[in-house]
């Protein structure tokens, strides 16, 4: 295990440090997001998973809202979210609260994610679908990304969400195939994750699919390249790479701090393979503001071009 973080690995303070780092207007945006979440009793993965980019994203007026409560039924060895085999039932008003909060923020792109809920028959797919539909009703031009579990491999649940009106279907494979048993809960596995991403694309081919991989867990370059090859084979459009950070001493240790140069190498490999977008860097996370900005403009551009083509051929 490395002794401390390298000098080039710096994380800005997300809360108290935010006011001095950003302008007063930006800090007010951070406070606005935090206040609206607290008032509506909503959770974000930004806080629960101790994301290092919380200051940047919240100051940009966006966050990743975590549906289905804040307690996960699984116990992955990299994750800081609370776990319990029998978490409280989901709040039936959560989809409505989420729509209210997001519309108030005035954003054009939102990410919805959740804990794993293996205790719910459909894994929470219908809850997600209802939230997406309410968001679209309140703001039709809003782009919605859903970062979801593997739904225990239940393809009916994948289909429910894929057809809900969302724009980006995201599910994280997390790590290379060899390391899956050591990193993820036993109920998750590499092939099951690939099958859910593949089915989402089969059900709705125009849907953007996305996944994320943590580096620094002991993977080899060949394994990372093979993972990208597997993802492209099932039509995944977007992949992100970020450095794994150990949340507590009870979680997996960091094997190495991957250099910025290596992250850039993986970005180039992914782009050469044909991914529509690759975000790769030590601080990149699956729900990352810079990536959302790029995806938003890419989706709008491609849809505008498609509409023009239809008009010309009419």
Swiss-Prot record:
A GO term from the CC aspect: mitochondrion
Annotated region (Disordered), positions in chain: 1-21
Cofactor, free-text remark: Binds 2 [4Fe-4S] clusters per subunit. One cluster is coordinated with 3 cysteines and an exchangeable S-adenosyl-L-methionine.
Catalytic activity, EC: 2.8.1.8
Binding of [4Fe-4S] cluster 2, residues: 72, 76, 79
GO molecular function: 4 iron, 4 sulfur cluster binding; lipoate synthase activity; metal ion binding
Intracellular or extracellular location(s): Mitochondrion
Keywords: 4Fe-4S, Iron, Iron-sulfur, Metal-binding, Mitochondrion, S-adenosyl-L-methionine, Transferase
Cross-referenced CDD domains: Radical_SAM
SMART domains named in the record: Elp3 (SM00729)
Pathway: Protein modification; protein lipoylation via endogenous pathway; protein N(6)-(lipoyl)lysine from octanoyl-[acyl-carrier-protein]: step 2/2
Family: Belongs to the radical SAM superfamily. Lipoyl synthase family.
HAMAP family on file: Lipoyl_synth (MF_00206)
Protein name: Lipoyl synthase 2, mitochondrial
Organism: Phaeodactylum tricornutum (strain CCAP 1055/1)
